[in-house]
């Protein structure tokens, strides 16, 4: 039995969407919901307002206050415009960049955003078609704009779309601007939105920005000579119907690779993602067609970018010639190992160089940094925090690479969001480097494990939906704080970190301060054998995440499978000790 009071509230909100201010299709969709005997669609669409969070908007497309549509996008943009005008009131001409991916309605939403900004007297640089997220970030810096909006829902299912807000450094908004924008958006009513655009303030951009961006991406190349020797490296690439199709094959060609094969069916721009269940390069199902082509061509590497081309997944052959997926931690490890090793070999390292990883990403990276005497910085999850580290050291230090376990990587500082364009090009260079030495990417990974220690990472998502679920997650975190674990699957905990208190406690009870830009509801436990467990509630979904990392030693590459089997056993023991 549906809650009568809730239905009445939703009906009242829905009635407002029958006003002439709303377009005919929207009014018709709302009428159908109101007239239907089943009120599920009405409740889902109107029981709350789609929340503009610290990352912007993300939701299912459709009519209603809890859906992505031109009206919810419009109110978000009006609020963002109001905030920009507050912050830059002394500026003669505020400007923004507007970009979008391949999703259904992405162009419509991008044009809506452009119209509203221009109606507010803000100059808009609007891309002529879909472009990668990193190019949006680049363009904000290129045009010295004060902000930007990217219409994308990354690798979410086809029903979703989203709205990412950027600041003048090309990074996603951080404090205090995130809260400032949210505050302004929450004050906007639909009648406040200025939908009628000013065409004189909208400039269509495209090829010139592509050229400028790709010229800068070429500077990421570390060893052009190895590419010349291995230009015929067999590369298979798929954009999964998304924005990578515009730029990534071109970037690979400009770097000097002459044997690039794109998965034909997935080079078609299509927001329905007809060839995959979910357009997520992390999962094997999304790479089915890519693996088909890679096997047929006996390729050296398969790379896939997600719909907005900011993350890259890859596959290569193992020691038995079987195709395997390389996960996000391993990819980040290979990237940073290669950058450090080869910058050193070519005499390109400076004392000012540093790398960044998120706190939940593999600690093998810390081992490499320590052994190679290079500064490594830890930051919170979310690429805006890596961008924050770059901003902190601008003009004083030299950022040479950073990444996270969730398949995001950035090898340059002229972009301030994760970049699958430069990542794919650099991955191809790393593969060429391996082939030049008679090795594969898999062999390189084994070499890293042999020198710095084996590591296996596993993420556990515990879902707890609804209000009771949110309360349960809060209680779990409270319990972990009041009674922190001392043993994890047989491993003795020797260091406890609480990022809400910004405090670390060692085995003797000695407390030290953790230096971070702000507090965050995250806990970490480190064990004497190198085991690490990180716990944090998701900021966007009703779940709590456990990131487990376990260590082992490899004597030879043939030990890998045995190490992995032991790691899986260890991970299960840790899960059991945490009642997961």
Question: What do the predicted segments below correspond to?
Answer:
Residues 97-160, 258-313:
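N-terminal small/polar loop signature for handling phosphorylated ligands or for N-terminal nucleophile
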Residues 17, 21, 25, 41-45, ...:
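Gly/Ser/Thr-enriched, mixed-charge loops and adjacent short helices
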